[in-house]
Amino acid sequence: MAFFELPGPAQRLRTDIAAARPNDQRWQVFEGDCNQSLPTALASLEEVRWAPTFAFVDPRGVQVAWTTVTALADWRRDKKKTKVEQWILMPEPALARVLGLRGVHGRRSAERLDRLFGSRDWLPIHQGRRNGTLTADAMRAEFVNLYRWQLENHLGYQTTHALQIVNTAGHPVYTLIFATDSPPGDAIMGHLYGSAVTSMIPEMQARAQVARQHRREDESGLARLPGMDEFAIEAAKGTPGSYQHQPPWRPTPVVDEALDLEGEPDIDPDDIYWDDDAEAADDDSRS
């Protein structure tokens, strides 16, 4: 087992694991930025690369680079079996603060999003939120969908699941994205998500249903009335508390590469206190 932590917490983690499992030496804690230490960790696990592997990616904010997720996906690819299963936590407050109505908070936040997604394919979503086309909920759904789309279509995962966790006030706290090639893993996670007292993002579920309906209409040559998508999405929203797997839909392609940062303070994303409560972050996304 490989664990990743910053230097201070890393030492405490070593102490806790050693106390809990004094006779077990099958673990190692790697200090520092996981984006930099992952290659060393994977090299240390080379002898067990044949084994099914699970990675829990739990960042504070939006620090994990797409190159890190890609490295995990590639690690067992030549084994012609399943890739590393990834369970990735996407913090909703982080998305709300960096990607809210006021837009990306300066050039450094834009660069952090480039690193998070591995490209600037997030730009149409930012533009939609900026011009009022997307609500805060729709923005979150689109960003999570983009991440899932890339996991399946860029990295080749067969299935992804997305589950939104909310607090007692009903405000989003984070979304858990699970990516797998394993039918048993798919079945187990689908069952766990369905059994949890949680819900899939209603906005995402509805948009996926409408996107599939659009594809069927396009294949049949049927015309659609302009401006009706949001009405269809509202009508398609499911019952809160239920989980139904929906595949990601094709994200909006980048057409206009202009990034409007007028009036935006150039805030370093590492200076944002991500542990503020979700309700405050949600308010930021609506302002």
Question: Residue spans of the language-model regions?
Answer:
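Class I S-adenosyl-L-methionine-dependent methyltransferase catalytic core
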Residues: M1-S287
